[in-house]
């Protein structure tokens, strides 16, 4: 009896009431791209406690030398920090146009210089392809799922989700 009740509730929630898709039908795609990026980062980063995850706090914000955090952040403070960090990264990748948000989300996780290159790291193949105007970047984006040379399934899932939510062909 309980199973039947649960099934009918689920069926009622999935039954459309008119011809246009509802907010529930669209899910995360109903949000603007920046909001999708924020929600994706929050989901995959998880909450960082200052005592256990120093120098990271909130949803993966790296504490900078001039920042003084003595206790945990509120969710609102962490949300503000995340949005600020992501906005700065979007500005850093602005010249890449429609790929700037996708690159910013990747840089939030791996660091901008693994993508842009510097003295320690060469410019990524992903960025080289984007600069040449090539759009087959999925494989190169998914290559950022390695840690110590091994492909990590959870990171690969994150990259695949990023692509589904933010990649514009």
Predicted regions: what is each one?
Residues 1-12:
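Classical Sec-dependent N-terminal signal peptides that target proteins to the secretory pathway
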Residues 12-48, 61-66, 73-89, 114-169:
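Long, amphipathic alpha-helical surface segments
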Residues 48-53, 92-102, 140:
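Surface-exposed patches in mature extracellular/periplasmic domains of secreted proteins
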């Amino acid at each position: 009896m309980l199973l039947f009740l649960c099934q009918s509730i689920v069926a009622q929630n999935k039954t459309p009431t008119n011809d246009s898709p509802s907010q529930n039908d669209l899910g995360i795609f109903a949000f603007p791209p920046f909001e999708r990026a924020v929600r994706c980062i929050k989901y995959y980063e998880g909450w960082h406690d200052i005592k256990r995850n120093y120098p990271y706090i909130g949803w993966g914000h790296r504490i900078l030398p001039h920042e003084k955090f003595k206790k945990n952040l509120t969710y609102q403070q962490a949300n503000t920090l995340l949005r600020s960090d992501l906005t700065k990264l979007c500005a850093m990748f602005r010249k890449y146009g429609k790929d700037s948000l996708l690159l910013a989300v990747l840089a939030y996780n791996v660091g901008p210089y693994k993508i842009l290159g510097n003295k320690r790291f060469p410019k990524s193949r992903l960025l080289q392809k984007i600069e040449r105007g090539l759009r087959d970047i999925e494989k190169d984006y998914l290559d950022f799922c390695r840690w110590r040379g091994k492909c990590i399934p959870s990171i690969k899932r994150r990259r695949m989700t990023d692509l589904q939510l933010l990649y514009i062909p």
